[in-house]
Amino acid sequence: MTKEELCRYCSVSMEDLDNGCAYIDLSNSSVDSLPDNLNVPVLFLRNCTSLERLPENLNAFSLDISGCTSLTSLPASLRVGILTLDETNISEIPEFCMDMCQSISAVDCKNLKRIPKIHKIGRLDLSGSVIEALPETLEVCDYLGLVGCKNLTSLPASLKQVNRLNVSQCENLRSLPEDLFVIEDLHIEHSGIVRLPENLMVGNGFYASHTDLKTIPSQVRIGGLVDLSYCKKLFSLPEGWIVNGYLGLAHSWIHELPEHLTVKGNLDL
């Protein structure tokens, strides 16, 4: 597709396209190529199953290529701020691309086994991917989603603080980084986690149902609700523990509560 054809298809002017002002939405189309050197604020290419490659020197604030099943790689020259590549066959994200990204969503990318070295990113969702390890220097500010990443066995020690963390259904993940502070919600349901960091802090909800947790360290602090239902290896709670919201213990093996336990919400036994 040439620039002229792109302008006609999307009803935008060549001037706007050349000046980087054109909003381009080609989702669900049969487009199989795009012109090189595109500079656009937003480029939607959802479910363009005939598209086999992205143009060279593509510069976009937001790029959505989710469902582009014929795409297997990204150009090294790609410059993008928000990248959505859910349900694609992409196996690797270029390292230079990661330096610019504020947000990456790679949900259900079954060929994505690793991501390159990255220091800090706002949002990273790799749920349903076959990712085996995360960069040792990784820092995520807002959200880290790893739901169902069954090949993941550990999280980097550099992950000290994150707004929201979801590692539910990570069957081979046994522990969390030491001194972890999750500002809002922490989800570990149906994961392989068997122990919590001694100084874990969660600002809001802690969701840990259907795990093999055996103990809750006395220094763990949770700001909101706590769901420990179906934790069949958990026999006790810390003495003097304070739960500021709902406490779910249904179908756990806790038969006796600590004498000085404080629950400020509903208690479900």
Residue ranges and their predicted role:
Residues 1-33, 41:
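N-terminal capping/linker segments that flank leucine-rich repeat
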Residues 15-19, 97, 179:
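Short, surface-exposed loop and linker segments with low hydrophobicity and enrichment for Pro/Ser/Thr
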Residues 22-30, 39-50, 59-70, 79-90, ...:
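Concave beta-strand-loop units of leucine-rich repeat
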Residues 34, 51-54, 71-74, 93, ...:
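Canonical leucine-rich repeat
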Residues 56, 76, 98, 157, ...:
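Short amphipathic alpha-helical segments
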Residues 137, 158, 260-261:
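Short alpha-helical interface patches
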